[in-house]
């Protein structure tokens, strides 16, 4: 359910003619969109804007400060698609997007795909709020399919990559029309599946971006490791995750391991009929062919900063980002790459609230990495890749990468 969080928001639907006047320069028209609704807003953030709190629940620590108001224009809409899993706005239509255009623009654009199988508002608290306050325009997509049945249309993960590319091109064109000049920089960022999308975009469409920040992106490799190689052993009770994360395993087992294994196996190997714990990726040639279509190579074409928590209970760091960092090195692209292994970080920051003496949130580390990328694009090299120690005093707002 999409709601304005403050009744006095002054969000109004406007006609195309009014939208033209509302823009700082040109019309608010998203190229290729089948439907769009444009609103002027006193606040584009989660403190007062149109969003879906259920979509971003659990992704950030409770102590994250509320954002200050950012006035501007919001565009909600969808691109042509024939699947209907996303019910936001009562549209029952996938490939939904949100684009936010702050009145005080810094010249930049941030593009993001949703984590997990969430919808287009999933990054609002973790990413949109913060980049809007820095003056960026922000665009996010539901990736073309949502929910635990996301795989129903086939080639679902292939579509994710296509939808992020589609949105990036459309958002860049919209920004150029709205502000009467092109974006001076375009940054891709996202977490989990969204981090995978950052990696894929910088490998396959570096011409669209100036750089990216990958927050615990999912690794897909035809030869493994990938979700389908390490989740079945975890379900069988084999040691997959670091022993130091054992206190988190009951949570991840209950909420993530089997569900994640099942839905991604359904997406990539729908003919398998056995128990998920017994799944053997190496013996499933159809699955290998499907993963080949979405696989990463490490051949990034623009600067990328990756961060990953050492206590991630869904994506074991030694079978995910450690491997991706080595792929980048072997591809000869390490000059474009920084990798920060964050001690005490886990996959979802809400767990920090339950274990503040053992974990640390990654949200502030993502913001530090984003600021480091900004400086890198301005000519200042970021800190060297490193394992970032957990400090004695942990804050939901502070993180030093070195």
Predicted regions and their residues:
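Accessory cap/linker subdomain of secreted extracellular hydrolases
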Residues: 22-95, 99, 215-299, 384, ...
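Cap/lid segment of the alpha/beta-hydrolase catalytic domain
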Residues: 111-172, 177, 345, 350-358
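C-terminal subdomain of alpha/beta-hydrolase-fold enzymes, centered on the catalytic histidine
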Residues: 270-402
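Gly/Ser-rich "nucleophile elbow"/oxyanion-hole loop immediately N-terminal to the catalytic nucleophile
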Residues: 101-106, 157-162, 170-192
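Primarily recognizes the serine-hydrolase "nucleophile elbow" in alpha/beta-hydrolase
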Residues: 64, 119, 185-235
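Secretory targeting and sorting signals
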Residues: 1-20
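A fold-wide structural signal in alpha/beta-hydrolase
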Residues: 75, 84, 88, 98, ...
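Loop/turn elements at helix/coil->beta-strand transitions in domains of secreted/extracellular proteins
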Residues: 105-109, 133-138, 181-186, 207-211, ...
